[in-house]
Amino acid sequence: KYIVNCLDDKNTENCGICKNCIGYEEFSSVVSKDSLRKAVAFLEKVLLPIKARVQWAKTDMSGQTRIDMPNEEGICLSIYGEQGYGTMVKSGKYETKKFCDSLVEKSASVLRNLIFEKGISQLAYVPSLRSDVVKDFAIRLAAKLGIPCIDVFRKIAAKMQKEMENSSFQCSNARKSFSLRDGTSLSGSILLVDDIVDSKWTLTVCGYLLRTAGAEHVYPYALACSSKKRAD
């Protein structure tokens, strides 16, 4: 009725349902504190799987071939920028330049069973030349989990993955950006940590490098997913 009146239609009738017609709200638009608490609690329980890529993209470095040493399925804590942990990740990455203790605590809580069940003995992280925010988080998380944090990757300057036009460019960019430090030798199962997952090529390449150095299994973990397709 309100919209019809705005259009100057004189032939309007009361619907008998909306506030404009009956003079009051049939259902309250005020969100109770209890409902808000339940909504936040629900969002905090959202965990996304990081399904492993099993095939290389066709690039200037490789054909479209099978990845012979893929990652195991990993875990993503939140959806980037969304209420709850997703907001904390965004704030830590771009505002405070440090991920808060709540993210460390929650991550440790999420990962403890995986660490125990899979016998994960070390934590490796994806380095960045722009910031040490992931390194700092990884060190604190490893301490909370009671496993060593290892610094095994070398990173060279490159474009950001989100600036790449398609999967082939993202794959090529990641493969050219990362390498292992000289003499790196690994064994057992490793937790691979990054802050944000999108195309999964960074985690795929870094996980593959860990496998080539002797790691038996690599389990990715990311604080947030920024992909419209989510982490799967």
Indicate residue ranges for each PLM-predicted region:
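Glycine-rich phosphate-binding loops at beta-strand->alpha-helix junctions
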Residues: Y125-V134
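Acidic, divalent-metal-coordinating active-site segment for phosphoryl/phosphodiester hydrolysis
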Residues: D194-C206
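Active-site signature of alpha/beta-hydrolase-fold catalytic machinery across serine-
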Residues: D136, R140, V205-L209
